[in-house]
UniProtKB/Swiss-Prot annotation:
Source lineage: Archaea, Methanobacteriati, Methanobacteriota, Methanomada group, Methanobacteria
Annotated GO biological process: translation
Cofactor(s) the record lists: Zn(2+)
HAMAP family associated with the record: Ribosomal_L44e
Protein name: Large ribosomal subunit protein eL42
Native species: Methanothermobacter thermautotrophicus (strain ATCC 29096 / DSM 1053 / JCM 10044 / NBRC 100330 / Delta H) (Methanobacterium thermoautotrophicum)
Cofactor note: Binds 1 zinc ion per subunit.
Amino acid sequence: MKIPKERRTYCPNCRKHTVHEVLESKRRKASELKWGQRQFRRVTAGYRGYPRPLPSGNKPVKKLDLRLKCKECGKSHIKKKSFRAGRVEYVA
């Protein structure tokens, strides 16, 4: 998949549309303290089994997190929607 190296998008720090540099970052492990994970631990505690059908098979590729770094202020933020991509190529 081809992704442009720079894009003009909204910067929450500057509060306006500016040119951003597109960087790739690895997805971090999901937080164990989120409500869903706490609920899951509560449901599976004790002698109870798994509450839903077991997920079968592995996903073919990992999800990609794009980090956008503002050229004006230098702050970076993550693009909200992440997606799966096998090969990523950054195009000028």
